[in-house]
From Swiss-Prot:
Pfam families: ACP_syn_III, ACP_syn_III_C. One of its GO terms (biological process) is secondary metabolite biosynthetic process. This is Beta-ketoacyl-[acyl-carrier-protein] synthase III. One of its GO terms (cellular component) is cytoplasm. It comes from Koribacter versatilis (strain Ellin345). Residues 259-263 are annotated as: ACP-binding. Its EC number is 2.3.1.180. Catalyzes the condensation reaction of fatty acid synthesis by the addition to an acyl acceptor of two carbons from malonyl-ACP. Catalyzes the first condensation reaction which initiates fatty acid synthesis and may therefore play a role in governing the total rate of fatty acid production. Possesses both acetoacetyl-ACP synthase and acetyl transacylase activities. Its substrate specificity determines the biosynthesis of branched-chain and/or straight-chain of fatty acids.
Length: 333
């Protein structure tokens, strides 16, 4: 009998910059209060980079921790997939910069732009490379410097986002191992592009005095429509992937959702009839770090002892685009 080859997560590493911006700091910057932010988002503070620190820098720090935790050299990595919407520059890709900074001699890689679903999309992509049998070590990273595209006079967005990164190493399962990435469902619905976007800097609106004056290089968000879609879609995607695998919310040992808003996560868990002790919420400390949220939440789950070998783990995300996804995996260590 031949075992099914799956991709398993064998190591994890995360990084957030040391500088913290609290709700009380924001009270001095815009018309808001700590209580208002907490009640509507669940966020108390977020970490921000200093000037000159980019997405590749956070990615490299997370990757170094990941590889050290696995006890391998960077040179063993064969492929790098980076989920980000805040690349250091339009090109070269963040993956190229990470490869160079880590000193990996024979890897290839690329970036995945899927908003807050970026880590999930990257994880699936990396898993498929492992499943193909062509690669044995794929580095998957989610890294975003959201502060680079936030208008800190706009209270609708500046209270939400933070900077951070996380990395996982994917390797093939051994014969007889029933762990790894079990299933996934992803979707894009471009009709949602009008609700969360950054219009400046691309080929449609290249950088100019006009785009700067019109604040087109900042995030624009219709929070109400994004919230409604996220609550509906995250529940829908998680229910689909569970049903396809003959599981229910009670079979899940750990639910790790994109940390966009505490109310979205709670609403999804309630719809799945999942006890809140199985739900990972760390948005209070980090805010929304876009592609960084899920690996950062994985680290929280590990630290809290909620991830053990064989645990059924459900991941879910909704992001700009709209993009959405749910991934079912069985924890490997």
């Amino acid at each position: 009998m031949t075992s099914v080859r799956r991709a398993k997560i064998t190591a994890l590493g995360t990084y957030v910059p040391p500088r913290v911006l609290s709700n009380f700091d924001l009270e001095k910057m815009v018309d808001t209060t700590n209580q208002w932010i907490l009640e509507r988002t669940g966020i108390r503070e977020r970490h921000l980079v200093d000037k000159g620190v980019a997405a590749s820098d956070l990615a490299v720090e997370a990757a170094k921790k990941c590889l050290a935790n696995r006890g391998i050299e960077a040179a063993e990595v064969e492929c790098i997939v980076v989920g980000t919407v805040t690349p250091d520059m339009m090109y070269p890709s963040t993956a190229c910069l990470v490869q160079h900074k880590l000193g990996i001699p024979n890897a290839w890689g690329f970036d995945v732009s899927a908003g807050c679903s970026g880590f999930l999309f990257s994880l699936t992509t990396g898993a498929k490379f492992i499943e193909s049998g062509q690669y044995k070590k794929v580095l998957v990273i989610g890294s975003d410097v959201n502060s680079s595209m936030i208008d800190y006079t706009d209270r609708a967005t500046c209270i939400i986002f933070g900077d951070g990164a996380g990395a996982v190493l994917l390797e093939p399962t051994e014969d007889g191992e029933d762990v790894g990435v079990m299933d996934h469902i992803h979707q894009v619905e471009g009709v949602g592009g009008q609700y969360l976007y950054m219009p400046g800097g691309g080929s449609l609106n290249p950088a100019s005095h006009e785009t700067i004056d019109q604040k087109m290089h900042y995030v624009h968000q219709d929070g109400q429509n994004v919230f409604k879609y996220a609550v509906k879609k995250m529940s829908e995607m998680t229910e689909k992937v569970l049903k396809r695998n003959s599981l229910t919310g009670t079979d899940v040992d750990c639910f790790i959702a994109h940390q966009a808003n505490k109310r979205i996560i709670v609403a999804t868990a309630e719809r799945l009839k999942m006890p809140m002790e199985k739900v990972i919420i760390n948005i209070e400390k980090y805010g929304n770090t876009t592609a960084g949220t899920i690996p950062l939440a994985m680290q929280t789950a590990l630290d809290e002892g909620k991830l053990k070998k064989g645990s059924n783990v459900l991941l879910a995300a909704v992001g700009a685009g709209f993009t959405s996804g749910a991934t079912l995996l069985r924890w490997a260590f």
